[in-house]
Each structure stands twice: as structure tokens, then as C-alpha cells.
Amino acid sequence: MASVAVESQPSVVTRVANLPLVSSTYDLVSSAYISTKDQYPYLKSLCEMAEKGVKTITSVAMSGALPIIQKLEPQIAIANTYACKGLDRIEEKLPILNQPTNQVVANAKGAVTGAKDAMTTTVTGAKDCVASTITEVVDKTKEAVTGSVEKTKSVVNGSINTVLGGRMMQLVSSGVEKAFTKSELLVDQYLPLTEEELEKEAKKVEGFDMVQKPSYYIRLGSLSTKLRSRAYQQALTRVKEVKQKSQETISQLHSTVNLIEFARKNVHNANQKIQGTQDKLYLSWVEWKRSIGYDDTDESHCAEHIESRTLAIARNLTQQLQTTCHTLVSNIQGLPQNIHDQANHLGVMAGDIYSVFHNASSFKEMSDGLLSSSKGQLQKMKESLDDVMDYLVNNTPLNWLVGPFYPQLTESQDAQSRGAENTTSPETQQPETKRIKPAPASSAWGSQSGDTSCTVATC
């Protein structure tokens, strides 16, 4: 029953706050504080910030001290009992505490001045008594909380040091170190240094001080940046090489068509001119054979052989050009529609030119109009190819440079390349095509297409 009585007894702080004199004084102070904030906006913002800070600190302190207060509840209850008894005696001696401020001021202005010192002394004593009790409780709470925190920190630090010093953690750390080192070596092997990086390496001066290795996170970020930069430079170089070789192919085709046209126009003029044209065609054949690694200057160069070889050159060049155009069409997924249209038109024109030379067995089967239209198509192809390649070079990011990627041959391409090595001749061997497959990350271009992978021709 005693415990029930203690638990049901109100807190001394609540009783003091509920006293009419204290509550009315609080109302006056609160109204003055609010009016001051309303009159001075800058002071209002500072006061609001202070209020939020006090509320936050109080909530944190209460949440942290609540378990300790619950443990010390019997002692706090005893202190509260003594404080309440003291407050009862004060209320008996000072009935003015039960009167509001306005009434006290109205009824006894003069008495207030005389009793000010006595009341101040009494209130100060009660406040000191309550404050000392609360201070003791808070100090005990702080000590208990601080001790618990220090013990927890020591246990956690000991556990972490034990885990980090264990053999398993050392094996994991060693494995991560080897993986990073191997990845950096592979990047340097398959993606060589760019010119800018070579210049930076040349400017570096090696000292004798040991340089501390950066953390794993810094090395991972540096590896990702290096991989993207070098892959972009390599892809850019390949695009430029494809552009240059395509232009060379078109130029060779243009020269071949001019030679065929010249031979057709002068076939009835004179045998000497025919012989000169045949010599030019034969030299073109020999030069082309040497460019692919074969030297057959001892072969016969009669008119029939010259015509067949010239047509073979034209067929091979148009086939290479057609392959390049088809590869280009498959590589520009996600680009603007006008670039798609130009690339598709390139493929159509390349197919038309290939059909012209594929179906012809001699110069006689090729009319002047057919040769003129072929030259016009070659000129249009050169312009369109320049536009598409310039767009690829000058508009980044390229959609094969997103996320972790690695070059690999697809199964169909691998089988096709192995079959081509066994069945095709050196004159008609096709360029190798590699696939660069990005991770399924969204790209600035790839988001418009369902397939984010693309191939880069290495020809």
C-alpha cells in the first residue's frame, strides 16, 4: 500500500508549476517573450532556432536517461516525498503562493515590497532543494550512461580488432588486393596508355620516399575512370580507322570504275590505248594484291585476265564496303532517326553497287549509264559516310562506353569467322568484328533502343 501511495503522489515539480503564483508569472513571462519575438523578426528566428535546439537536446537526454531513471525510481520517489513535504510547509507559511500575480499586486503593492526578500529567500531555498535533488539524479544518470557507452565502445572496438586481425579477414584483404592489382594490369595490357597519360607519366619525377597505397575505394574509382577514358579513346580511334579505310575503299572503287569506263570508251580507238589501259588495270591489280600480302607479278596480263581481275577487285571492294555499311547499321542503335536513315541508305547503295559488279563478267556487260550512276552513288556514299562518322566522333557518350564492359565474340560471329577462314580466299576475306557488351545500365542513347549492345569493327 505504501508503494501505491508513493506512486500516486504528484511530482514536486508539477505542484510548483501548478501554484497560482508560479503559473500566472509564467503566463506573464510567456506573453512578454511572444510579443518580443513578434516585434523583432531577427530575434524571432534566433529564438526559434534556440527552441528547436533545446527540444532536440531535451528529447535526446530524456531518451538516453530513461533507463537509468527507471532504475533509480525508488530514490527519486523518496526525494520527491521530502520535497513535497517541504513544499507543504512553504505553502502553510506563505498563503500568497495560492494567489495569482494580478491579485497579489492589486491587493498588496506595498506588502509585496516588504515581503519580497522573505519570499525570494524561501523560493530560492525551495528551488535550491529541488535543483540539488534533480542535479544529483542527473549526475548519477550521466555517470551510468557514460559508463555504459564506454563499455559498449570497448567491446565493439575489441570485436572489430579481433575480426580484422583474424586469418579469414587477412585472406579476404589479400584476395581483394590481388584482384585490384590484376585488374589494373589487365587494363594496362588491353587498353594502353593514351597520349595524355604518357605525357603525365613522362613529367613525373620518381623520388626515394615510399608512397602509401590509396584505399580500395579510391583505387576502384580510379580504375573505373581509367577504364572509361581509355576505352573511349580506343573506340574513337577505331571509328576514325573505319572512316579512313571506308574512304580508301570508296576511292579505290572510284578509280576502278574510271579505269573500266576509260577502257570501254577507248576500246575501238586504238590497240595502243587499249594496251595502255590494260597495263594500268594490271598495275592496279598488282598493287591491290600486294596490299593484301600476295605478289603474283609473274601471272599473265592479257586482256581477258585483266578484265576478270579488275572485276574481281571491284567485287571485293564493294563487298568490303557493303560489310562496313551493314556493320555500321547494326552499331548505331539509339541514335537519331536521320542518322539511321543515312546509314540504311548507305547499305542500300552499297548493295546496288555490289550487284552491278557481281553480275558482270566483262566490261561489255557494263553500260556507260551504269558506270556513271555507280560513280554518283559512290560520291553520295562518301558524303553520307562522312556525316555518320563525324556524328559518332563528335557526339559523346558513345553507347558502348557505359558501365563495365568487355570485348567478346558472339557465338554466331565466332562460327562465321572460323568458317570464313576455311572457305574464303585471301581476296574476299572479311574483316573481324568484335562485340563490346555493356552492363545493363541506362545510356544517353541506349535508352531509346531495346538492345544496348553494339559492335565495333576492327577493320
Curated annotation (Swiss-Prot):
N-acetylalanine PTM sites in chain numbering: 2
Membrane topology of this protein: Peripheral membrane protein
Oligomeric and partner information: Interacts with IRGC.
Record region (Disordered): 412-459
Stated family: Belongs to the perilipin family.
Phosphotyrosine PTM sites in chain numbering: 232
InterPro entries reported for this sequence: Perilipin (IPR004279)
PTM notes: Acylated; primarily with C14, C16 and C18 fatty acids.
Gene that this sequence comes from: PLIN2
Official protein name in the record: Perilipin-2
Entry annotated with the keyword Ubl conjugation: yes
Free-text function comment from the UniProt entry: Structural component of lipid droplets, which is required for the formation and maintenance of lipid storage droplets.
PANTHER family: PERILIPIN, PERILIPIN-2
Tagged with keyword Phosphoprotein: yes
Places the protein is found: Membrane; Lipid droplet
SUPFAM superfamilies: Mannose-6-phosphate receptor binding protein 1 (Tip47), C-terminal domain
Any one Gene Ontology cellular component term annotated for this protein: cytosol
Modified-residue entries (Phosphoserine), positions: 215
Pfam families: Perilipin
Main location group: membrane
Polar residues compositional bias, start-end: 412-431, 444-459
Keyword set, alphabetical order: Acetylation, Lipid droplet, Membrane, Phosphoprotein, Ubl conjugation
GO terms (BP aspect): cellular response to glucose starvation; lipid droplet disassembly; lipid storage; positive regulation of triglyceride storage
